[in-house]
Amino acid sequence: MHITKLVLIRHGESQWNKENRFTGWVDVDLSEKGRSEAQCAGRILKKNGFFFNYGYTSVLKRAIHTLWIILDQLDQAWLPIEKSWRLNERHYGALQGLNKDEAIKEYGYKTIQKWRRSFNVIPPNICGGNNQFIATNDNRYANISTDELPSSESLELTLKRVIPYWNQSIIPHIKKGQTIIIVAHGNSIRAIIKFLNHLNESEIFQINVPTGVPLIYEFDKKANTVQHYYLK
């Protein structure tokens, strides 16, 4: 049976991961540990003989830089890459920038867990016209309709922007038998996992995607999922 492989990788640890802050769409770079995680992921993929035909990532530099580091390890810096805001992390609204422990003190542990892990609960919207964390103030989103840009998202809303992009841009490569790498974020990857694994809301609540660890999906010639596993 012909098998096509997809590699999903959450970016390496970011500076705000290290500081235990909600990041969302804020464009924070990798920490030193995050760069090391990306290098390790690249070495693991090289050891396992991966050769990619196409790459995808978000428009946030912690994911972009992770992909660059991985491709450098593979000596595939030439790989065609498509960047899309639809692969961005879930927008955490007013939580963006807050330390998670401080947020728990303010809102309560159960509320924060619902905002973080549930499927359809939305954190408070970000507000303030001059707020540096508002997407409409960012030039990288200048050509995107303001109706499409979120001010906060649940995982459900994240899935609703990720999966149409998956179907339109990524699946055609898989159906051609091409090997794809996607470097994205915890919740955009959780959205893909939910879709591919047909998980219900309680099942996706339990899913946590580690930073910098390759998650492999194998597909048959009809692009049906055969199996998935982490490479460590």
UniProtKB/Swiss-Prot annotation:
SUPFAM superfamilies in the cross-refs: Phosphoglycerate mutase-like
Broad enzyme group: isomerase
Site for Transition state stabilizer, residues: 185
Residues involved in substrate binding: 10-17, 23-24, 62, 89-92, 100, 116-117, 186-187
Classification via InterPro entries: His_Pase_superF_clade-1, His_PPase_superfam, PG/BPGM_mutase_AS, Phosphogly_mut1
Alphabetic keyword roster: Gluconeogenesis, Glycolysis, Isomerase
Protein origin, superkingdom: Bacteria
GO molecular-function terms, A-Z: phosphoglycerate mutase activity
Reaction equations catalysed: (2R)-2-phosphoglycerate = (2R)-3-phosphoglycerate
Oligomer status and interactors: Homodimer.
Protein function: Catalyzes the interconversion of 2-phosphoglycerate and 3-phosphoglycerate.
Name recorded for this polypeptide: 2,3-bisphosphoglycerate-dependent phosphoglycerate mutase
Gene that encodes the chain: gpmA
